[in-house]
Structure formats: structure tokens, C-alpha cells
């Protein structure tokens, strides 16, 4: 759709109440998608109330996946949703934490920027929060900045962010809108939905000085008109601005569900903008239609050590789903714990898989299971995709079992190994701090013509995002290639090996980068597309 000129950037804040994990990120991404479909330039940012500077050092069991932006910032997994919905890259400015806010304020205090004043939460912390909110809208790059406030209203750690929203609503006037997402529980014994938690959540928000313009009610099933009217009355919100977000088979149906309730139109009306005709969203609908039409199944295994947590490999899961749909297949994803697989049971766990992904990660735990899985997959020519540590494990297994390098390993796992086929990158050897110091962000990669991976991308020069400290040891490169593991992707500036594949196998590819970070609903990453095609043709 043709772009629309907006005089002032509009700011939409999305807060949550009652409980966490209601789907503020999905609602934010869905609203952003609807506005984008109308021709507006939209970006979404996430404010997380934890004191970590970023989630880069957080255990996936604590936080889920760590997403990496195009400029190399480690962020919350919600940014992955933003990118997959909007088909646009995010940057450091799209992810802010309490830790970063405080770090910035303390750095300013140390420089003397506050001229000897007492530094306090109000105004210094709130001013820094507001500065970061406005940063994305300052250069006239976006018509809408949607800001998701992490956590739940009433949490002590969220108070400075809610106060900042209150101040911004006063400062921005009609250029600002507040959407509050709450939960409406169903009480089985009484056989009815209860709105009291929503009323109390809105009351808490009002006590903090913020009156929501729009409510989104999360519920398992559709709510009746009387419940919506009651919520509108007691929460002081217009009836048409009470939107419901019920459980649907896939998160990608949420934009259409919100569009049917005119959420984007209501937002435009409240912001004083022309509504215009409702966009068709045809490419999005086509994607959902393909999902519903698919009947044949592709069975993919994911071997990793964090499989107990649903969100630990979120971008990989979604990338596999999207690629499967575009290959007209339903995805049957089997999660295989790398600590529970060995040579004895590998056949039992892997034999009926159409393809297997060896997941990324860090540390010694679970790698021996990955070696066992890789050995079975290689020997039985089952399509395999290794990502980051997954690629490194493919290299180590090949070194041990094909090259005969006994004890070959990564210096991450065994600093004393006699055959460090994976070694710490040279520029990492003097790094002391853990946070934000890896090789992060987008780098160039040149692919070897005639390779499977080059055929998948359809071009020789690509860019992908990275998150690692260790790399393939080029001292072993000739031996690997002579034995059949080809180094088919390299960084053109450093010679760092970015991709390997084994000659003679249908699809046995490992990549040092993370292709899942660039796969979106309307633009699936070619590597996942190629992998699923290989799995289908197994």
C-alpha cells in the first residue's frame, strides 16, 4: 500500500495486567501489522523491567530464547515476533531494560552531566526512559512507535515505566494511545467468566495516573456482549474499544481476529487520523490458507538441551513452521533432549525423522548426545541442519569418526584437547566480561558455487546474524575437505568458516550463524526452505 504522511509520530503503549505471559508481544505485533498494511511506517520496541543490561547472559530456562538484532544487540524473544510479523529488522533501540536505563544514568552522573544534583528515579530515570521511547520517532523514520511494557501493572519493578507512560501521555497529548491487556479467567465451578481481575488491574493503572484508551481481554473462548459492556462501564472505556483476544490455533491468526473487531480503525480514530478502507492483507491470508490446506506431514526432530522450555528455541520453531507451510506440509516437531540420546537409542529416537536440527547452545552439558545423534544422522543420510554449536558438533563428530582424530573437541569443552578443531576466536582471547562481548550481529558470507547451501540461497553472497565466541579451526581445513566435509561458506574478510556440508549426502549442512533470526512470515529464510524440501524428499 502507498505510504501515508503523518505530521507527528504517534506513540502506542501496550501494558499488561492480572498475570504475565498473556501475549502483549503478539498483540503489539498484530496491531503493528494492521497499521503497516494501511501504509504506515511502524516499529515496535520492548521495555523489560529486569536489571540485567540485556538477556545475553540469562539462562534460557529463565528467559527463553535470546534474539539478536541486525546491529548485534541481544534482546528479548518478543523482538523475533516483531520481525516475523512486520518483516522488518530491529535494532538496539528496539530493546531496553531497566539495567540499560540505570547504566546510562549512572554513566551520565559519573561524567558530571547532572552538575552535582541528586540523581533520583524521578526525574532522572523516568527522563531516560522517555528519551529511549522517543528515540525511534525522533528522525521521522516511523509514523508509529509501539512500546510494549514488560511485566504486569502493580509490579514494583514496572513502576518507573508506568510513570514514564503517564508523563508521556501528558506531554504528547493526542499523539499517544494506551492499550491495556488483561486476563478474564473462566471459573469452571461457576461456569462463568469473571471480570473482577480486569477491573482491579485497570484500577491499579488508573491509580498510577494512566487511563487506558483501549482494553484487550484475553480469554479461552469468545466473551458475550454483556461481559464486554460491563468491562467498558466499570473500566471507563468506550464499548467499541473493548477488544477480545481469544485462543486461536496459531498466533498468525491474531491480526485478522483484531482486524475483525476494528482495533486498528479504533486506534486511528482515537489518534485523530483518517481511517480509510480496511486493508485486505492478502499475502497474510494466503499464508494462513496454505496452513489450513496442508495435509501431508513433515516430521522434524530438534536435538537440544533446553527442550523442556517451549520458548528456548522459539525462532527455530517458528522458522521450521513457516518453511513447512510454504512447502505445503504440516510440521510435526519432535523435541529430543540431547542428554537423553546416545549410541544405543539413537535409532529409536531418530529413524523415523524426515529431518533433524541440531540446536545451538553453550557449554559441555548435552554435547555427547549431540555427537551420537549426528553420527547416526550422517551414517543414515537423514537431512540434518546444525546451527551454531550444532555446526561445531558436526565438525567435532566428523573429526573423531571420519578423520580419526581421537579426542578432537572444542576448546570450550576441553581446553587441553590435542585436536582443537573448534577454537576460541582470536579477538576473543583477551575478553574478560561475558555480557555483550561475543561476535554479534550481521556479517557477510560467501558461498561456494555448486554447493547445496548455495543452491538453497540461490546466490553466492549472503548476510546472516551471529552469536558465538568459537570458530572452525582453519588449520584443519584441508584435512576436512579431503575427507568430504567441505567448507562451503566463509567470511570474505576474515576467512572464518561459516558453513560446512558433507559431500555425497542429500543434506548435511552446518552453519555458524543463526538463520532463524531472519526468517519471517512473508519471507522465510532460504536455508530453512531448502532443509524442509530435503526432508520432504528424504
What is each residue range found by the language model?
Residues 1-332, 338-355, 362-363, 370-376, ...:
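Flexible phosphate-sensing "switch/lid" loops adjacent to ATP/NTP-binding sites
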Residues 8, 211, 238, 296, ...:
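A generic structural signal for well-ordered coil/turn residues at beta-strand boundaries
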Residues 16, 46, 219, 246, ...:
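Active-site proximal loops enriched in glycine and acidic residues that flank catalytic Cys/His/Asp
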Residues 22-25, 29-33, 37, 349-444, ...:
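Cysteine-nucleophile active-site neighborhood
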Residues 62-70, 248-252, 358, 379-387, ...:
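Short beta-alpha connecting loops at secondary-structure transitions
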Residues 66-78, 239-247, 409-422, 515-524:
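Short, basic, helix/turn surface patches
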Residues 440-444, 448-538:
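C-terminal and late-domain segments of enzyme folds
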Amino acid at each position: 500500500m502507498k505510504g501515508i504522511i503523518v505530521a507527528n509520530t504517534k506513540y502506542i503503549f501496550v501494558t499488561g495486567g492480572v498475570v504475565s505471559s498473556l501475549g502483549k508481544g503478539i498483540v503489539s505485533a498484530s496491531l503493528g501489522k494492521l497499521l503497516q498494511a494501511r501504509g504506515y511506517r511502524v516499529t515496535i520496541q520492548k521495555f523489560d523491567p529486569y536489571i540485567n543490561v540485556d538477556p545475553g547472559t540469562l539462562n534460557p530456562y529463565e528467559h527463553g530464547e535470546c534474539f539478536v538484532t541486525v546491529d548485534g544487540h541481544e534482546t528479548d524473544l518478543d523482538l523475533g515476533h516483531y520481525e516475523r510479523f512486520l518483516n522488518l529488522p530491529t535494532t538496539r533501540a528496539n530493546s531496553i531494560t531497566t539495567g540499560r536505563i540505570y547504566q546510562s544514568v549512572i554513566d551520565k552522573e559519573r561524567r558530571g552531566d547532572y552538575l552535582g544534583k541528586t540523581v533520583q528515579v524521578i526525574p532522572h530515570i523516568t527522563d531516560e526512559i522517555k528519551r529511549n521511547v522517543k528515540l525511534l520517532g525522533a528522525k521521522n523514520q516511523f509514523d508509529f512507535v509501539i512500546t510494549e511494557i514488560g511485566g504486569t501493572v502493580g509490579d514494583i519493578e514496572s513502576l518507573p515505566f508506568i510513570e514514564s507512560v503517564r508523563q508521556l501521555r501528558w506531554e504528547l497529548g493526542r499523539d499517544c494511545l494506551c492499550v491495556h491487556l488483561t486476563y478474564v479467567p473462566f471459573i469452571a465451578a461457576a461456569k462463568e467468566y469473571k471480570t473482577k481481575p480486569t477491573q482491579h488491574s485497570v484500577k491499579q493503572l488508573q491509580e498510577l495516573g494512566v487511563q487506558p484508551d483501549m482494553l484487550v481481554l484475553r480469554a479461552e473462548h469468545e466473551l458475550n456482549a454483556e461481559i464486554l459492556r460491563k468491562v467498558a462501564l466499570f473500566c471507563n472505556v468506550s464499548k467499541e474499544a473493548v477488544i477480545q483476544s481469544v485462543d486461536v490455533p496459531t498466533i498468525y491468526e491474531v491480526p485478522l481476529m483484531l482486524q475483525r473487531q476494528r482495533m486498528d480503525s479504533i486506534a486511528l480514530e482515537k489518534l485523530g487520523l483518517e481511517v480509510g478502507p480496511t486493508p485486505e492483507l492478502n499475502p497474510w491470508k494466503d499464508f494462513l490458507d496454505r496452513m489450513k490446506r496442508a495435509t501431508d506431514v513433515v516430521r522434524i526432530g530438534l536435538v537440544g538441551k533446553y527442550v523442556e522450555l517451549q520458548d528456548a528455541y522459539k525462532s527455530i520453531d517458528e522458522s521450521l513452521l513457516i518453511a513447512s507451510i510454504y512447502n505445503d506440509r504440516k510440521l510435526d516437531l519432535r523435541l529430543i533432549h540431547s542428554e537423553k540420546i546416545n549410541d544405543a537409542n539413537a535409532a529409536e529416537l531418530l529413524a523415523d525423522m524426515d529431518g533433524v536440527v541440531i540446536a545451538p547452545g553453550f557449554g559441555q552439558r548435552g554435547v555427547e548426545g549431540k555427537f551420537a545423534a549426528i553420527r547416526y544422522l550422517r551414517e543414515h543420510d537423514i537431512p540434518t541442519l546444525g546451527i551454531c554449536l550444532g555446526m561445531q558438533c558436526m565438525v567435532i563428530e566428523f573429526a573423531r569418526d571420519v578423520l580419526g582424530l581421537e579426542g578432537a573437541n572444542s576448546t570450550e569443552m576441553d581446553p587441553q584437547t590435542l585436536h582443537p578443531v573448534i577454537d576460541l576466536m582470536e579477538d576473543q582471547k583477551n575478553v574478560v566480561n561475558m555480557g555483550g562481548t561475543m561476535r554479534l550481529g550481521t556479517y557477510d558470507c560467501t558461498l561456494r558455487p555448486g554447493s547445496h547451501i548455495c543452491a538453497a540461497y540461490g546466490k553466492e553472497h549472503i548476510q546472516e546474524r551471529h552469536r558465538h565466541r568459537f570458530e572452525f579451526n582453519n588449520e584443519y581445513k584441508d584435512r576436512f575437505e579431503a575427507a568430504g566435509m567441505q567448507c562451503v561458506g566463509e567470511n570474505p574478510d576474515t576467512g572464518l568458516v561459516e558453513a560446512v556440508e558433507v559431500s555425497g549426502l542429500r543434506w548435511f549442512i552446518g552453519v555458524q550463524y543463526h538463520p532463524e533470526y531472519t526468517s519471517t512470515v512473508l519471507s522465510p529464510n532460504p536455508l530453512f526452505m531448502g532443509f524442509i524440501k530435503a526432508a520432504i524428499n528424504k
